[in-house]
Amino acid sequence: MALVKTKPTSPGRRSMVKVVNPDLHKGAPHAPLLEKQIQKSGRNNNGHITTRHKGGGHKHHYRVVDFKRNDKDGIPAKIERLEYDPNRSANIALVLFADGERRYIIAPKGAVVGQAIANGSEAPIKAGNNLPIRNIPVGTTIHCVEILPGKGAQVARSAGTSAVLLAREGIYAQVRLRSGEVRRVHIECRATIGEVGNEEHSLRQIGKAGATRWRGIRPTVRGVVMNPVDHPHGGGEGKTAAGRDPVSPWGTPTKGYRTRRNKRTDSMIVQRRHKR
């Protein structure tokens, strides 16, 4: 995997930096693991915009990724090929099990074609293997971590991310996330050893606005260039500052305003990611 800076043959390619991985499969994805995706464009069932800055973009199928990995314990498997996934920053790996079934998993860092993959409490501590947290040594780097047993991985799934198992106390373990937050999870939750691959994803340069539109992202217009009817920062003669602390179009404070409201799980957070 390497970063490639394109030649300046056009203004859009002048600043483009691509991540090139020659090991990725160049053919079609595994058809039985594809699902149709209907484009919502940020609209709800009434057609109203509920999420701004979404719409357009290239059509693509959803790749069904196995985030649970709890029903193939003890069955040997190997990585058949590595693939690009347009739905996420990480690459995915097509895994062939000894019983003939194929599944997609998040490709760990250092994954190669032919690599052995194991699931279950007896699996060795090697990158890509999935185990319950009670069987993982303290200090191990992990990814694809479950928050609730059996629900499937929810944490550390993006390219280059990981978490660290800090301690085990009774039926809970402490995991430090990439944000710095330390969280308690049940020891029956599962996690995958190692880091997520494609760690150079954050270093790419898209190069032009059109490439962002291909990804289904629409432009973000600043509030200070709107009219007063459209945004609290709007209006004024010429270029004018907002005249107040940053807020959303609906007046909610932004840029640092905390929006977490899930008090039910506050007891599971040992150390918050915020400094104060």
Swiss-Prot record:
Superkingdom, natural source: Bacteria
Composition-biased stretches (Basic residues): 50-59
Pfam families: Ribosomal_L2, Ribosomal_L2_C
Signal peptide location: none
Alphabetized GO MF terms: rRNA binding; structural constituent of ribosome; transferase activity
Segments of skewed composition (Polar residues): 39-49
Region (Disordered): 37-59, 225-276
Record flagged with keyword rRNA-binding: yes
One record GO biological process: cytoplasmic translation
Disulfide pairings: none
Family named by the database record: Belongs to the universal ribosomal protein uL2 family.
Biological function: One of the primary rRNA binding proteins. Required for association of the 30S and 50S subunits to form the 70S ribosome, for tRNA binding and peptide bond formation. It has been suggested to have peptidyltransferase activity; this is somewhat controversial. Makes several contacts with the 16S rRNA in the 70S ribosome.
Protein name per its UniProtKB record: Large ribosomal subunit protein uL2
